């Protein structure tokens, strides 16, 4: 494991996620630290519940992007 002081350029811990809607099955890209409740573009179901930091994902994470 690399110590904190040897990392010269820190990488962000937030990611974009491809999430599948539990109601209709639509796949949509959302941000892992979303501050606003994201809804499905097809059926309108809520996919993300914002918390203080990392958002609570209400759908199924298909893939982590970037």
From Swiss-Prot:
Q: Which NCBIfam families match?
A: PRK00415.1
Species annotation: Hyperthermus butylicus (strain DSM 5456 / JCM 9403 / PLM1-5)
Q: Where are the zinc fingers (C4-type)?
A: 21-43
Name recorded for this polypeptide = Small ribosomal subunit protein eS27
Q: Which Gene3D superfamilies match?
A: Zn-binding ribosomal proteins
Q: Which GO terms describe its biological process?
A: translation
Task: Kindly indicate whether the keyword Ribonucleoprotein belongs to this entry.
Answer: yes
Assigned GO CC terms: ribonucleoprotein complex; ribosome
Give the signal peptide range. none
Give the cofactor note text. Binds 1 zinc ion per subunit.
């Amino acid at each position: 494991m690399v110590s904190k002081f040897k990392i010269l350029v820190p990488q962000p811990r937030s990611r974009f996620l491809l999430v599948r809607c539990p109601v209709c099955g639509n796949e949509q890209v959302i941000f892992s630290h979303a501050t606003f409740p994201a809804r499905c573009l097809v059926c309108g179901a809520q996919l993300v519940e914002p918390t203080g930091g990392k958002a609570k994902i209400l759908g199924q994470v298909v893939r982590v992007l970037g």
